[in-house]
């Protein structure tokens, strides 16, 4: 091991202070309170990048309203498999939050708010699709009570802002799921990391991991630099999680693990319009997703959301895609070119050839003017006034590109866990569905990276997630039990008391 002015040691180092690192840290603090733990965050606060509610494309979503998760098959039937899988994952996350509140790990449950989720379409063919979607989802316990709303008066009762001056001569419909949520993942991350620090963890803010080297004993030595003073030190860790958002790919590449070979990243930015006028926020009490535009990536479907940021209600509309070679909102313009390696060049070029529709979509988005953006907003809220809305720049999403024998490379919009074969290091790539499924993703990390301990941890994990290992959509009685428990503990009864059983 090289020597510098200072060397520290930790059982676990978590790179990044967002929701992924916060979740794994909280799980490990509960499972192994005797382990030493260090968070290393390049910015000066928790959740200042992708986990911030202003940088997160969707907050609290669980496949209730996102139409790209329920594609139509060639025969006209609806494939709900992905929606069910994501909702199953969200239920795992929701149970852990309830456990954390019940056991004092989370002292303020205001990070999650009950808000209906809705899908919104226009045109006869789209309405028919939404009808079949509702018919396909409703029998599943996880989607019980999802409604199809075609009546204009009922539409106006549910969504006054969207109904005002709308021409209902065109067929218009909603799928409405009253048991949705809004989640401030920034507030949640701060509480989870606070719990870890109270238990003895160290949190280094304004510090960046510049390199990491595997030692002969299987541990990792990280070179960490204080971004304010320039001081450097080494930290030796038995396990490393690279939960650094867009910075994960470069760090995994520096680690040299074979499992990271062939992966590349394609950054997609986002911008939103937002408004805090109380008249508007009172007139739109839901998250409403439209149908994805042709060529748009999954995270590109336009939606008009009510969000709570630090307890304050906002309306947020977008995203409008942006592009930058940066892998982080606060990153560098050299991030993309510096990530290119001989082993991922073919994958990058393959995507460049096969994703022409996506490229055309991005070019079109970059050419949007302020009037264009307001015109798109008025498709959701016809009476929108320019002066009520301001444009805000969201975070970067580095979508995964993986090697493909036939096409060279494919663009993957899911979250991918990359772990070394010996379990000493793991990293998170990709962006969707992301934060809402943080707990099952981290449980996967625990199982893959701590295989020798996982079996002994199972009793404690099943206390945290009572349905662990069970497919809830196949066990409606258990689902109702854990759902009702979580609803009560998280204080989500407000809109849930009339949820159909």
Curated annotation (Swiss-Prot):
Key words of the record: FAD, Flavoprotein, Oxidoreductase, Tricarboxylic acid cycle
Molecular-function GO term, any one: L-malate dehydrogenase (quinone) activity
GO biological process: tricarboxylic acid cycle
Pathway: Carbohydrate metabolism; tricarboxylic acid cycle; oxaloacetate from (S)-malate (quinone route): step 1/1
Catalysed reactions, as listed in the record: (S)-malate + a quinone = a quinol + oxaloacetate
EC number: 1.1.5.4
Pfam families found in the cross-reference section: Mqo (PF06039)
Cofactor: FAD
Top EC group: oxidoreductase
InterPro entries: FAD/NAD-bd_sf, MQO
NCBIfam families assigned: mal_quin_oxido (TIGR01320), PRK05257.2-1 (NF003606), PRK05257.3-2 (NF003611)
Family of the protein in this entry: Belongs to the MQO family.
Protein name per UniProt: Probable malate:quinone oxidoreductase
Organism, scientific name: Mycolicibacterium paratuberculosis (strain ATCC BAA-968 / K-10)
Recorded name of the encoding gene: mqo
């Amino acid at each position: 091991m090289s020597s510098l002015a200072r060397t520290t040691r930790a059982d676990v180092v978590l790179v990044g202070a967002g929701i992924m690192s916060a979740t794994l840290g909280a799980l490990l603090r509960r499972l192994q309170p005797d382990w030493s733990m260090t968070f290393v965050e390049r910015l000066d606060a928790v959740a200042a990048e992708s986990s911030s509610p202003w940088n997160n494309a969707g907050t609290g979503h669980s496949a209730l309203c996102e139409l790209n998760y329920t594609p139509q098959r060639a025969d006209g039937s609806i494939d709900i498999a992905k929606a069910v899988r994501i909702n199953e994952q969200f239920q795992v996350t929701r149970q852990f939050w309830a456990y954390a509140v019940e056991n004092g790990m989370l002292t303020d449950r205001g990070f999650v708010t009950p808000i209906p989720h809705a899908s919104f379409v226009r045109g006869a063919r789209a309405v028919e699709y939404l009808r079949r979607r509702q018919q396909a989802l409703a029998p599943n316990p996880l989607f019980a009570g999802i409604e199809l709303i075609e009546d204009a008066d009922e539409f106006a009762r549910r969504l006054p802002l969207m109904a005002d001056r709308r021409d209902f001569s065109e067929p218009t419909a909603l799928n409405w799921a009253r048991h949705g949520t809004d989640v401030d993942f920034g507030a949640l991350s701060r509480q989870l990391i606070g719990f870890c620090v109270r238990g003895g963890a160290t949190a280094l803010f304004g510090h960046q991991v510049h390199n990491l080297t595997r030692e002969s004993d299987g541990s990792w030595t990280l070179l960490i630099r204080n971004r304010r003073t320039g001081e450097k030190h080494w930290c030796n860790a038995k396990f490393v999680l690279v939960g650094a958002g867009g910075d994960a790919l470069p760090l995994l590449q520096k680690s040299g693990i074979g499992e990271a070979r062939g992966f590349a990243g394609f950054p997609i930015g986002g911008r939103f319009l937002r408004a805090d006028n109380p008249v508007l926020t009172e007139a739109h009490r839901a998250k409403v997703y439209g149908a994805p535009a042709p060529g748009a990536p999954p995270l590109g479907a336009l939606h008009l959301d009510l969000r709570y940021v630090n307890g304050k209600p906002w309306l947020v509309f977008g995203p409008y895609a942006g592009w930058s070679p940066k892998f982080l909102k606060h990153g560098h313009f050299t991030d993309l070119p510096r990530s290119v390696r001989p082993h991922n060049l073919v994958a990058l070029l393959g995507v460049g050839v096969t994703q022409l529709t996506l490229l055309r979509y991005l070019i079109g988005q970059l050419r949007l003017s302020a009037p264009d953006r307001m015109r798109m907003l008025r498709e959701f809220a016809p009476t929108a006034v320019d002066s009520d809305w301001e444009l805000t720049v969201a975070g970067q999403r580095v979508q995964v590109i993986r090697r493909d024998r036939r096409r060279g490379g494919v663009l993957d919009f899911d979250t991918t866990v990359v772990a070394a074969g010996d379990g000493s290091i793991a990293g998170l790539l990709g962006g969707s569905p992301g934060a809402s499924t943080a707990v099952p993703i981290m449980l996967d990390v625990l199982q893959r990276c701590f295989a020798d301990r996982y079996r002994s941890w199972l009793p404690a994990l099943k206390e945290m997630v009572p349905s662990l290992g069970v497919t809830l959509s196949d066990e409606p009685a258990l689902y109702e039990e854990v759902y009702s428990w979580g609803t009560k503990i998280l204080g989500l009864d407000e809109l849930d008391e009339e949820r159909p059983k």
